[in-house]
Curated annotation (Swiss-Prot):
It comes from the Bacteria. Keywords: Nucleotidyltransferase, RNA-binding, rRNA processing, Transferase, tRNA processing, tRNA-binding. It comes from Rhodopseudomonas palustris (strain TIE-1). Phosphate binds at residues 86, 124-126. The keyword Plastid does not apply. This is Ribonuclease PH.
Length: 237
């Protein structure tokens, strides 16, 4: 039995609310159960120096957690003077995931920066961030299209992410913190709307897992991502 009493293949309650920040070109408040992330997408008429003059744009991401997103206060990274390794890893993952489904040439020589700020953390902050980031990005691109700044289909597909793991010997979908901290195995799957893999992160925390168990986790992830993609499409209309 899962602590949340969910079925093994059951997502937490998920919501994706678009257009929640009035100043941002795109925004989304994403909730995976008690994990809440505010995502904004900002259009910038600038590019990294190494991209200038190449006729294509760029999508990048930043990630952070509010000090009381967790049970005990976490020191702000700004006060420490540097980002920790986990933060850097996650924001690079978010940026990579988004770029796989964006036509950077169609975007033109401009950059979209996606900021993911964790308001409350209960497991799965990176997967919630990626899922909400797609909505904020789509919101931003719709804003640009309404102003004739872009033409055609800049977004090639959806992208969403979900965690899976083996908890008490059972493969389960969408781990919350209580499950993640006790899981024998946990993995994060990033997938496109048509089911292709973007990235897989998997770790045996206590017991090595077999190929069959991995395939069971991937099957759960495919089911979960398909549901998330449906919710993304509903959110952007």
């Amino acid at each position: 039995m899962r602590p949340s009493r969910r079925a093994p293949d059951e997502l937490r309650a998920v919501s994706l609310e678009r257009g929640v920040v009035k100043y941002a070109e795109g925004s989304c408040l994403v909730k995976f159960g008690d994990t809440h992330v505010l995502v904004t997408a900002t259009l910038e008429e600038r590019l990294p120096p190494w991209l200038k003059g190449q006729g294509r744009g760029w999508v990048t991401a930043e990630y952070g957690m509010l000090p009381r997103a967790t049970l005990e206060r976490t020191r702000r990274e700004a006060s420490a003077g540097k980002q920790n390794g986990r933060t850097v890893e996650i924001q690079r993952l978010i940026g990579r995931s988004l770029r796989t489904i964006v036509d950077l040439e169609a975007l033109g020589e401009r950059q979209i920066t996606v900021d993911c700020d964790v308001l409350q953390a209960d497991g799965g902050t990176r997967t919630a961030s990626i899922t909400g980031a797609w909505v904020a990005l789509a919101d931003c691109l719709n804003w640009m299209k309404a102003r004739n700044m872009i033409k055609g289909q800049v977004l090639r597909d959806n992208v969403a992410a979900i965690s899976c793991g083996i908890y008490n010997g059972t493969p389960v979908l969408d781990l919350d913190y209580a499950e993640d901290s006790e899981a024998e195995t946990d993995a994060n799957f990033v997938m496109t709307g048509d089911g292709r893999l973007v990235e897989v992160q998997g770790t045996a925390e206590r017991t090595p897992f077999s190929q069959d168990e991995f395939l069971q986790l991937m099957a759960l992830a495919q089911k979960g991502v398909a549901r998330l993609v449906d919710l993304q499409k509903m959110a952007v209309g």
